[in-house]
Amino acid sequence: MRFKPVIGLEIHVQLNTKTKAFCSCPADVFELEPNNAICPVCTGQPGALPVPSKQMYEFGILLAAALNCKIHEFTRFDRKNYFYPDLPKGYQITQYFYPLATNGYLKLNGKKIRINRIHLEEDAGKLLHSSETITQAESTLVDMNRCGVPLAEIVTEPDIESPEEARKFLEKLRQILRYLGVSTGDMEKGALRCDANISVIDLENNVQSNKVEVKNMNSFKFVEKALEYEFNRIKKHLKKGENVVKETRGWDLASKKTISMRSKEEANDYRYFPEPDIPPVVIPKEEINKIIEKIPELPDEKINRFKIQYGLTDYEAGILTTSINLANYFEECVKETKNPKETSNWFLTELLKYISPEEVFENLKIKPKHFKELFDLISSGKITRNIAKEIFKEIFETGKNPEEIVKEKGIEVIGDESLIEDMLKKIMAENEDKVNAYKNGKKGLLGFFVGQIMKQTKGKADAKKANEIAKRLLGD
C-alpha cells in the first residue's frame, strides 16, 4: 500500500519590535524575571485600552512582501475567545476576518508552498511546568511577560508532502526572517513556533484520513520527528481500516511520541467578533510601498548574484548566504582580496570552523585586510598553503598581521635555490642506492628526496622548487 502525507503549517513568528503589540511594555522579554514586563493593557485590566504598534505593522508588511503575499490596505482586529491560564483577558486580539495579507508563496527547491494568510496578533503568556514534559509535571507556574508580544501568524496551504520538507520550509522561513531583521527566528527561545496539521492519503484506495493537529515542537528536528511519528501512526490506522480521530496531539520529548491533548477545535468554538476597542486600521498603498522598498536582497536573489558575480557553485553560494551577516562579511573580504574563489575556499574550509554563520562579524578580530595579507604571502611564495592554515587560527584569535606571526615563529618558506640544492646533494650522497634505483626506472623515489628535504626543514622548504631541483640533479 502507498501512502502520502498532506501537511499544512501554522507558524507563529515573534516580531522583533521595541514594544508589545498594543502597549508600551518591552517586547524582548526572554531573559526577564517572570511577571516584570506587564501593564494593565497586556494583562487585560478593566478600563485599559490597546493601541496597535506601528512597528508591528511595518514588520508584518515586510514579511508579507517577502513571502509574495497580497497586502491589504484595510485590516481589522478581532477577539478570539477561549480560557487558558496564560491568557488573562480571556481572549486574544487577532485578525480573523480581515488579515494583513493573503495568497502568497515561498519557493522551496523550485516548488511553491502556498501561503494562505498572514495576520497580526498578540502572544499569550507562558506556562512553566515543574517537569520537562506536561505529563510528568506536578505543578505549573504562569509568567505573563509574554502577554501582548506581537506575532505574525503564517498559515500555509497543505502543500507540504513530507516531514523533511516541513523542516526545510521552516529553515528557509527563518533565514528570510533574519535577513529582514523582523525576528530572531529562534525556536528554542519561542521566537518561532510551529503547529502542524497532517492527514494521510491512501493512494491505492483513494481514501484520506481526518486531519490531526500536532503541537509542542520546539526545534526543527522535533518538527520532523513528530510528523514522521504521526505519519506512521495514521498509516497504521488506515491499514487496519480504522477511523483516525480528529484531534490535537502534542509531541512528548520523553517518550518521543505524540500524545492526545484534546479534540480539535473549530473556528466557531472561539466565537470571533470584532475588537470593540480598536478601530479598523487602514494603511494607504503609498505607505505600504514605502515599507516594501526597505526589503533587502533576499537569500535566493543573493545566491544567484553570488554565482554570476563571483563564479561560485550552488553549494558555495548557498553556504555563504546562510546569513546576511556572513554574506556581507564575505563581500567585504572580496573587496580587499579581489579573489572571490580563493576567499570562498578559505571561508568554507577555515573560517566556518571557528564561527557560526550568525556571528556578529564586526566583533571578529580577523578583518578583511588579513585575508588579503595572507593571500599575498602565499602567492609571493613566502609561506606555503599549509603554513597559512597553521597561522590562520592565530590571526582569528589575536588579530595579528599574518606577516608578523610568520616572523615571530620563523616559519617563512625557504626559497633559496642554492641552499635547497646543497641540501639535496647531501641527501643524495647519503642515499646512492636510491639514486641508482631512480635512474633505473623507479621514478616514485622522487618523493623520497623531496620528503627528506621537507623533513629536515620542518616543512619550510619550497616544495615546488625542491621538486624541480631534485629532478634536475637526478638527470631528468
From Swiss-Prot:
Superkingdom classification of source: Bacteria
EC number: 6.3.5.-
GO molecular-function terms, A-Z: asparaginyl-tRNA synthase (glutamine-hydrolyzing) activity; ATP binding; glutaminyl-tRNA synthase (glutamine-hydrolyzing) activity
A Pfam family this chain is assigned to: GatB_Yqey
Broad class of enzyme this protein falls into: ligase
GO BP annotations listed: glutaminyl-tRNAGln biosynthesis via transamidation; translation
KW ATP-binding (keyword) present: yes
InterPro entries noted in UniProt: Asn/Gln-tRNA_amidoTrfase_suB/E (IPR017959), Asn/Gln-tRNA_Trfase_suB/E_cat (IPR006075), Asn/Gln_amidotransferase (IPR018027), Asn/Gln_tRNA_amidoTrase-B-like (IPR003789), GatB (IPR004413), GatB_C_1 (IPR042114), GatB_Yqey_C_2 (IPR023168), Gln-tRNA_amidoTrfase_suB_CS (IPR017958)
Keywords: ATP-binding, Ligase, Nucleotide-binding, Protein biosynthesis
Substrates-to-products reaction catalysed: L-glutamyl-tRNA(Gln) + L-glutamine + ATP + H2O = L-glutaminyl-tRNA(Gln) + L-glutamate + ADP + phosphate + H(+); L-aspartyl-tRNA(Asn) + L-glutamine + ATP + H2O = L-asparaginyl-tRNA(Asn) + L-glutamate + ADP + phosphate + 2 H(+)
Record-linked SUPFAM superfamilies: GatB/YqeY motif (SSF89095), Glutamine synthetase/guanido kinase (SSF55931)
Database matches in Gene3D superfamilies: 1.10.10.410, GatB domain, N-terminal subdomain
Oligomer and partners: Heterotrimer of A, B and C subunits.
Role played: Allows the formation of correctly charged Asn-tRNA(Asn) or Gln-tRNA(Gln) through the transamidation of misacylated Asp-tRNA(Asn) or Glu-tRNA(Gln) in organisms which lack either or both of asparaginyl-tRNA or glutaminyl-tRNA synthetases. The reaction takes place in the presence of glutamine and ATP through an activated phospho-Asp-tRNA(Asn) or phospho-Glu-tRNA(Gln).
Entry-linked PANTHER family: GLUTAMYL-TRNA GLN AMIDOTRANSFERASE SUBUNIT B MITOCHONDRIAL AND PROKARYOTIC PET112-RELATED, GLUTAMYL-TRNA(GLN) AMIDOTRANSFERASE SUBUNIT B, MITOCHONDRIAL
Family: Belongs to the GatB/GatE family. GatB subfamily.
Official protein name in the record: Aspartyl/glutamyl-tRNA(Asn/Gln) amidotransferase subunit B
Organism: Thermosipho melanesiensis (strain DSM 12029 / CIP 104789 / BI429)
Higher taxonomy: Bacteria, Thermotogati, Thermotogota, Thermotogae, Thermotogales
